[in-house]
From Swiss-Prot:
HAMAP family: Enolase. Mg(2+) binds at residues 242, 286, 313. Belongs to the enolase family. Pathway: Carbohydrate degradation; glycolysis; pyruvate from D-glyceraldehyde 3-phosphate: step 4/5. This is Enolase. NCBIfam families: eno. The keyword NADP does not apply. It is found in: Cytoplasm; Secreted; Cell surface. Keywords: Cytoplasm, Glycolysis, Lyase, Magnesium, Metal-binding, Secreted. It is an enzyme of class 4 (lyase). Its EC number is 4.2.1.11. Catalyzes the reversible conversion of 2-phosphoglycerate (2-PG) into phosphoenolpyruvate (PEP). It is essential for the degradation of carbohydrates via glycolysis.
């Protein structure tokens, strides 16, 4: 038995300088597991609740001392003595202790920090790397990275409404080469932006935030960078978009400030997305519609679900109940997985498994506020998810995940697999 003998929660800072929760879990053997939770900038209204102090005298109200106190008192008392290798039982204990549907009493950030730290301690105790502990011997697939190279929306201070413009190295032979391809395109893009006299400062997730005339201009910059780096757009490196459409949905219309204040109905906005898919090598669109625009989602899915990957983030918030509703209604064909949207590892794995059974893809994702914690890299391999979103090719909080995936690929050796285009099951 890997008994938990001590838990220590603390307030640390994330990549945006905002407080977050870190947790250490000590086992009877002396082994310790540590984890820190991420935080989002654009959040779905149905996400599990991240507990903040609300005290304007500390961190502009964003402190997490209440969540830390919950870790060090009530949660600690409930889990001390439990077997760290019984992850599902431990997570159920946390869920029952909180007693709310959205984890608002204890805070999803407090609960997730403990859930992750326990898994890390148990993996260390077993002598296994975390990905192997989580997934077993069948965990051999590295994820295709979706690299956010141009930022807009809530992640940048420019006129772009769409939140992320991503490159996806679908033609790479392995993860190491995929990472190299992405880095080379990133640097080519930086030179192009610099030569145009625009700022090469990066946003929260490490991508550039140039002030361009419209969204297609941003896409064309990326295509130019792919060519300049010596790669073929579409065949070797495809494109992905995170629209984060809930952020620019106003009074039933999609209001695009980056298109001169254009106000579009759902069908008109879908027409624009479909035109981009026909014109450019776009293979993935995330949150193409407002999270509550069910009719819009149905129309988008009917129009494009057999052509591109349609990812639900705010739509599903890593929640199996919401995902099942989407599956039943044939809305989207993919789910974004963010561990802090739901608050425990067990619930995270349940969402991934449900997606797979329904023929949906699962994309493991970071948040805009990250730490050096690399758990999502191990989850991506441990679950054979096939895809990961963890930012651009800059900022150590993003690179940490890529470097961990390099180590995992090296550890797997000849059995390591890189799915490339096959990870995107819905391409025409």
């Amino acid at each position: 038995m890997s008994a938990i003998v001590d838990i220590v929660g603390r307030e640390v800072l994330d990549s945006r300088g905002n407080p977050t929760v870190e947790c250490d879990v000590l086992l009877e053997s002396g082994v310790m597991g540590r984890a820190a939770v991420p935080s989002g900038a654009s959040t779905g209204s149905r996400e599990a609740i991240e507990m903040r102090d609300g005290d304007p005298r500390r961190y502009q109200g964003k402190g997490v001392l209440k969540a830390v106190e919950h870790v060090n008192t009530e949660i600690s008392e409930a889990v001390l003595g439990l077997d760290a290798s019984e992850q599902a039982f431990l997570d159920k204990t946390l869920i029952d202790l909180d007693g709310t549907e959205n984890k608002s009493r204890l805070g999803a950030n407090a609960m997730l920090a403990v859930s992750m730290a326990v898994a890390r301690a148990a993996a260390e105790e077993s002598g296994l790397p975390l990905y192997r502990y989580l997934g077993g011997m069948g965990s051999v697939q590295l994820p295709v990275p979706m690299m956010n190279v141009i930022n807009g929306g809530a992640h940048a201070n420019n006129s772009l409404d769409l939140q992320e413009f991503m490159i996806i190295p679908v033609g790479a032979p392995n993860f190491r080469e995929a990472l190299r391809w992405g880095a080379e395109v990133f640097h080519a893009l930086k030179k192009i932006i610099h030569d145009l006299g625009m700022s090469t400062a990066v946003g929260d997730e490490g991508g550039f935030a140039p002030s361009v005339e419209n969204h297609e201009a941003a896409i064309r910059l990326i295509l130019q960078a792919i060519t300049a780096a010596g790669y073929s757009a579409g065949e070797q490196i495809a494109l992905g978009l995170d629209c984060a459409a809930s952020e620019f949905y106003q009074d039933g219309l999609y209001v695009l400030h980056g298109e001169g204040g254009l106000k579009l109905s759902a069908p008109q906005w879908i027409d624009m997305l479909a035109a981009w898919v026909d014109k450019y090598p776009i293979i993935s669109i995330e949150d193409g519609m407002h999270e509550g625009d069910q009719d819009g989602w149905k129309q988008l899915s009917e129009r494009l679900r057999d052509k591109v990957q349609l990812v639900g983030d705010d739509l599903f918030v890593t929640n199996t109940r919401l995902l099942q509703q989407g599956i039943d209604q044939r809305i989207a064909n993919s789910i974004l997985i963010k561990i802090n949207q739901i608050g425990t590892l067990t619930e995270t794995f349940a969402a991934i498994e449900m997606a797979k059974r329904a023929g949906y893809t699962a994309v493991i994702s970071h948040r805009s506020g990250e730490t050096e914690d690399c758990t999502i890299a191990d989850i991506a391999v441990g679950t054979n998810a096939g895809q990961i979103k963890t930012g651009s090719l800059s900022r150590s909080d993003r690179i940490a995940k890529y470097n961990q995936l390099l180590r995992i690929e090296e550890d797997l050796g000849e059995v390591a697999q890189y799915p490339g285009r096959a990870a995107f099951r819905h391409l025409r």
